[in-house]
Amino acid sequence: MLTADDKKLISQIWTKVAEHGGEFGGEALERMFITYPQTKTYFPHFDLHVGSEQVRGHGKKVVNALSNAVKNLDNLSQALAELSNLHAYNLRVDPVNFKLLSQCFQVVLAVHLGKEYTPEVHAAYDKFLSAVASVLAEKYR
């Protein structure tokens, strides 16, 4: 459960993240593909090389979805319902992959935000991304 302090930290840091949507999202996906190569199977039609425009484009979509989640921290289930349906019923993505991408996204945040990515911010984002992953996996139950 996100506290009021968590929500404040998430929103404050997100303004910096959103400015670099394609870059941060693309880097997170690239890290996931390198670290967890089995995740590439969901993107057979993509050029998965580092710096690929397709990966950056999808990374921007990921960050846009997270932006929607940040705007709706009190109602993530409703905000992400359509995305949850898409991944569960159409794309049939194994929900463990949401957690893998969350881990990679946190590494990207730490790299780019440096000292601003304090232990408190890290904890808030860990809770936030875990909540997002849980909501995206709701339709699998």
Swiss-Prot record:
Tissue: Red blood cells.
Signal sequence region: none
Residues annotated for heme b binding in this entry: H58, H87
Domain of life: Eukaryota
Entry's Gene Ontology cellular component terms: blood microparticle; haptoglobin-hemoglobin complex; hemoglobin complex
Stretches assigned to the Globin domain: 1-141
Coiled-coil intervals: none
Pfam family, one: Globin
Gene Ontology biological process: hydrogen peroxide catabolic process
Keywords attached to this entry: Heme, Iron, Metal-binding, Oxygen transport, Transport
GO molecular function terms noted in the UniProt entry: haptoglobin binding; heme binding; iron ion binding; organic acid binding; oxygen binding; oxygen carrier activity; peroxidase activity
Family listed: Belongs to the globin family.
Function: Involved in oxygen transport from the lung to the various peripheral tissues.
Subunit note: Heterotetramer of two alpha-D chains and two beta chains.
Record's protein name: Hemoglobin subunit alpha-D
